[in-house]
Amino acid sequence: MKIVVYAICKNERPFADRWMASMSEADEVCVLDTGSTDGTPQRLEELGAKVSVQGITPWRFDVARNQSLELVPEDADLCVCTDLDEVFQPGWREKVEAAWAPGVDRLLYRYVWNFLPDGREGMVFWYDKIHRRKGCRWVNPVHEVLQFDGGAPQARYVEGVCLEHHADRSKSRGQYLPLLELAVEEDPNNDRNVHYL
């Protein structure tokens, strides 16, 4: 089974080493850098990632994710979308391979969105960014989700796989509001986007 991790990034050099170590169980790592000025693409390449640099104007997360997905080879069996401030607990690949089966479109796994000041897990929920290579695309300018061809995707839960989010608190999220407004304008009946707004 060929498993490929893909991601988008911009100025995330401090996370590169930890992230690449965590993703090393994959067969390949593909990254779309959207304009770093801190050496992120060079460091990722030194660590073995295949990096493409391309600005996205106007900025939309779905466009960036779709362009990063295009970097994944067509012969990949599974795609794993993560961000550079996320890390898998070791041993994730074996569990992902065991859970995958014909007819499955995506896998659901445990996601620790944040940690409390004392180090305990904060918000935890099921995440769904491990998916088949073909017949899906990212939608929504922000808080993007995968949309699958052919109706509702078949999902399977993976026990024992956990992705941890260690957010960069210094990064502004100021761009999110206009993107949320655009998302609601594009799809006013999308209750998820209305909720975020």
Q: Which role fits each region the language model picked out?
A:
Residues 2-4, 28:
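Cell-envelope/extracellular polymer assembly enzymes that use nucleotide-activated donors
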Residues 7-25:
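Short, well-formed alpha-helical segments that are part of the catalytic scaffolds
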Residues 14-17, 38-47, 91:
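Acidic helix N-cap motif at the loop->helix transition within catalytic regions
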Residues 22, 32-43, 56-57, 83-86:
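A conserved acidic beta->alpha catalytic loop
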Residues 26-27, 48, 76, 104:
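Short, well-ordered alpha-helix to beta-strand connector turns
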Residues 41-71:
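Conserved donor nucleotide-binding strand/loop of the catalytic core
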Residues 62-70, 88-197:
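Catalytic-site signature of metal-activated, phosphate-bearing donor transferases
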Residues 70-89:
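Short beta-strand-to-loop acidic/aromatic patch adjacent to the donor-nucleotide binding site
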